[in-house]
């Protein structure tokens, strides 16, 4: 094997936690190598050591057979290591050219920025990737996939020979993900080694050559993709066999009351009018392609965005829900798609995040907060949803994705909501934590909560939902239930609409 990268006996501890213990990893030139493990397994810490962000307590890094010590990120970049983080590091108001050369602008002989040379170099990089990017458009106007390609281009502009891709498909459509895989294969052909981190195990079998699995900061195994399967990988990642991620679906009472009835919702003046109902104890799925109107519908219902026409009832009573505060008073909460930026204040503690929407509940005097009462409630809801953390004072930014999602759920339970909207609830969450979130959702419906679940993952729509409203171009094309909920039927309505359909929207 033509080894370009060798990590040997890497060990790293933080106060009270041994994050990595004696980890070995070898990557070949031109190899796409998957790094798998649950959140908290040590993947991020290992990659931060490779990037010079953390220094190991013990162990060595070799690139092309030469020992390396990275005092900081710039040392790693100089050695040919590049990383594309899950959360982009682009400047939104700058164009692709300026983002690629930010802080290292090319200069002409008079010392002025040489825009022409930088633009030509950027064009050559994107031609190497085989992607079309408007070089003069502000980054904020590009699609998420195009921004991803700019991040990859930035790494290549720094002559990266080892490229780390951290959850690169998390916000991409299937078609965009396929485009990314094509780019990865081209880079592989050019000899670039890639470390691919993903919670989507099916992607591993599409694009990777070998896999290394970590668990609880320890090395488990390295195997060729052709010699393993999903079940074996899951067992290596979680240390046990997961029979099924999805809890059994209950039989809903025929007379289960409707807790939310949308009699008419028209977002645009000339747009379709949608109608649907949500019953107590039910999980209603919103399925469809990206941009089909699922999230837009949910946001319009709670008043986060305006609608041309909106007629709805909450537990039988007409409600306006002019804004999210109205929705909250009516007992409706939302777990947004971007939990880190829209659902949490990550620099706050668990306690402060859970109390955020309900501080009045703990007011002991006009301006004072009953911290003891707040702590008791926080401990209670953390226990109910299964948040795993050292204390209620733990900063949310340090939690895994699954535990962060549970903190958002705990906040809404603390506010006595009865309707919860889960928008992409398992995005960026590992396989074990997904099963916990699914189980928690079913526990909530068993206690009388009603849930709208928006998801781009077809297996969880099929496995979790009692009924499914399928969206296409802003319209609910059909509402499926029971045996009608299968992948083929959902995709037929999502892509082809009601041509030849037998189901009516609910």
From Swiss-Prot:
ATP binds at residues 37-44. It is an enzyme of class 7 (translocase). GO terms for molecular function: ABC-type D-ribose transporter activity; ATP binding; ATP hydrolysis activity. GO terms for cellular component: plasma membrane. Keywords: ATP-binding, Cell inner membrane, Cell membrane, Membrane, Nucleotide-binding, Repeat, Sugar transport, Translocase, Transport. It is found in: Cell inner membrane. InterPro entries: AAA+_ATPase, ABC_carbohydrate_import_ATPase, ABC_transporter-like_ATP-bd, ABC_transporter-like_CS, P-loop_NTPase. Its EC number is 7.5.2.7. It holds the Pfam family ABC_tran. It is a peripheral membrane protein. It catalyses: D-ribose(out) + ATP + H2O = D-ribose(in) + ADP + phosphate + H(+). Residues 5-241, 254-498 form the ABC transporter domain. It comes from the Bacteria. SMART domains: AAA. The complex is composed of an ATP-binding protein (RbsA), two transmembrane proteins (RbsC) and a solute-binding protein (RbsB). Part of the ABC transporter complex RbsABC involved in ribose import. Responsible for energy coupling to the transport system. Belongs to the ABC transporter superfamily. Ribose importer (TC 3.A.1.2.1) family. This is Ribose import ATP-binding protein RbsA 2. It comes from Burkholderia cenocepacia (strain HI2424). The lineage of its organism: Bacteria, Pseudomonadati, Pseudomonadota, Betaproteobacteria, Burkholderiales. The gene is rbsA2.
């Amino acid at each position: 094997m033509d080894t370009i990268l060798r990590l040997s006996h890497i060990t790293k501890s933080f106060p009270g936690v041994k994050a990595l213990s004696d980890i070995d990893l070898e990557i070949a030139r031109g190899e796409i190598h998957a790094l798998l493990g649950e959140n908290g397994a040590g993947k991020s810490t290992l990659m931060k050591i490779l990037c010079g962000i953390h220094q190991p307590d013990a162990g060595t890094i070799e690139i092309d057979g030469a020992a390396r010590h990275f005092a900081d990120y710039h040392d790693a970049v100089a050695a040919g290591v590049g990383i594309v983080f899950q959360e982009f590091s682009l400047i939104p108001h700058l164009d692709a050219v300026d983002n690629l050369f930010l802080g290292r602008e090319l200069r002409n002989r008079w010392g002025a920025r040489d825009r022409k040379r930088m633009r030509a170099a950027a064009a050559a990089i994107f031609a190497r990737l085989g992607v079309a990017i408007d070089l003069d458009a502000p980054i904020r106007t590009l699609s998420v996939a195009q921004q991803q390609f700019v991040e990859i281009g930035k790494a290549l502009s720094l002559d990266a020979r080892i490229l780390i891709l951290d959850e690169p498909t998390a916000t991409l459509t299937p078609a965009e993900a396929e485009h990314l895989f094509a780019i990865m294969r081209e880079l592989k052909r050019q000899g670039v080694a890639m470390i691919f981190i993903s919670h989507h195990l099916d992607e591993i079998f599409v694009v990777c050559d070998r896999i290394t699995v970590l668990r609880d900061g320890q090395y488990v195994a390295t195997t060729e993709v052709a010699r393993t399967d999903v079940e074996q990988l899951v067992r290596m990642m979680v240390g046990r066999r997961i029979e099924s991620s999805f809890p059994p679906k209950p039989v809903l009472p025929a007379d289960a009351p409707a807790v939310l009835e949308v009699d008419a919702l028209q977002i645009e003046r000339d747009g379709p009018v949608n109608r649907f109902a949500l019953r107590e104890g039910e999980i209603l799925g919103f399925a469809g392609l990206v941009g089909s109107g699922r999230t837009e519908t949910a946001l319009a219902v709670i008043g986060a965005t305006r609608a041309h026409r909106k007629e709805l009832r909450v537990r039988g009573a007409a409600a306006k829900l002019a804004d999210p505060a109205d929705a909250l008073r009516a007992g409706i909460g939302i777990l947004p798609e971007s939990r880190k930026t829209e659902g949490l204040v990550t620099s706050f503690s668990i306690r402060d995040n859970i109390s955020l929407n309900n501080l009045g509940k703990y007011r002991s005097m006009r301006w004072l907060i009953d911290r003891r009462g707040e702590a008791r409630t926080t401990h209670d809801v953390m226990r109910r949803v299964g948040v795993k953390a050292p204390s209620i004072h733990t900063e949310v930014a340090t939690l895994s994705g699954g535990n962060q999602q549970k903190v958002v759920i705990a906040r809404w339970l603390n506010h006595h909501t009865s309707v919860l909207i889960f928008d992409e609830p398992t995005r960026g969450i590992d396989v074990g934590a997904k099963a916990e979130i699914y189980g928690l959702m079913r526990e909530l419906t068993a206690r009388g909560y009603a849930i709208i679940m928006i998801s781009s993952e077809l297996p969880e729509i099929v496995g979790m939902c009692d009924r499914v409203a399928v969206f296409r171009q802003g319209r609910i094309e059909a509402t499926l239930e029971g045996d009608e909920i299968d992948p083929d039927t959902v995709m037929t309505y999502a892509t082809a609409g009601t041509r030849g359909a037998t189901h009516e929207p609910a």
